[in-house]
Structures are given as C-alpha cells and as structure tokens.
Amino acid sequence: MEAWLAKPELLSADADAEYAEIIEIDLADVKEPVLCAPNDPDDARLLSSVQGEKIDEVFIGSCMTNIGHFRAAGKLLDKVKGGIPTRLWLSPPTKMDAHQLTEEGYYGIYGKAGARMEMPGCSLCMGNQARVAANSTVVSTSTRNFPNRLGDGANVYLASAELAAVASILGKLPTVEEYMAYAKDIDSMAGDIYRYLSFDQIADFREAAANAKIPVVQA
C-alpha cells in the first residue's frame, strides 16, 4: 500500500486475464449521448429518441461521479442567469471531493443556482437519505433506476453528469444539438475541469490518514 501511495496508478487487468465475453464498441460510431429510460437500467436509448421530455428533478452524485463532473456542472450553472427550472440535488461521492469543491468556489455556484446540497455519499441513489417527489420525472447519474428506488412512482432516466447538468438548466431532456453546444463549452475547459483527485494531494486528509488508528481483529 505504501508503495502504491508513493506512485499511484489506475488498476488494470492482468495481461492473461480471461473474460466471459468481449464486447468491442467503436466510439467513432457513437454520435450522440445514450441514456437509460425509466425504469430499467437495461433500456438504453439515444438522446434523440427521448429529447424534449420535461424534467422535474435532477440528481448528480453517487459513486459513478468524480470531482470533474461537479466542476463541469458548476461551469455550466455559473453561466445561468437567475434560477433553474428544476430541483437539483448534488452529492459529491466523498468528503474529499466536497472539501476541494468548496475550496475552488463551486459550492457558492451551486448555492446561487438553488441546488440542494446533500452530504457526500449515496444520497438519492439508494433513496436512503432523501427522496424525490412522488411521480416526478428525474435525470440521475446513479447506477440503477428501478421502480420507486429514488421516489414513489418516479420516472428516472440514467445519464452522464454533463447531460444531467444540461437537463437541470433547460428543464427538459435537450435535443442533440442543444447538448452538443453545451458539450463544446465544457470541452473548451476540459484541461481544467477533468483533473482527478487523490487524498494524498490534500494536506488535511494526508495528515488524517497518517494518524488513523485502525483496529486489528485477531481470530
């Protein structure tokens, strides 16, 4: 662990790993965003087939997000004049992300937009900290959208954080052209937005880790 922390690398499969199935997707063939329609995570749809759907609430959070997604949402929200037409929930996946986003001024942007900030963690994904309004139509970045999971009778689309942010601003699922205009804006700032975060980059978290007392349970 100490060696990995000194030189962290993303995990990768062994060269001789065996798989039940290999599915190859040419990303050049993907011309528009893909969502999962209510209320089945296996019901994948192209954005163009569901565009225009009115959206009541948006959740950006869960373990599917990282700090870059919240920066991207913040950049888009910062350009909005006045309030947004949806109820927006934001829940960074870790306290570390929340700390850094606060330091970078994003929490002020979220507050100005009227977003509801949840404690870092699962939040709406499991419906165990709060729930969306009954029978609302929602865009969520979570991993599952089973019936009644996020709220009673809620219709939940699963989408990327960037698409979710756009939906929160427009109050609907955007057209492909509308989304691409926002995406172009995000892409122009990608180098600043999509910087991954590790706790060893923050002094407070590094100190806490160094002084952590981990009990050892002996059989």
PLM regions: where:
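Fe-S-dependent hydro-lyases/dehydratases of central metabolism
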Residues: 1-219
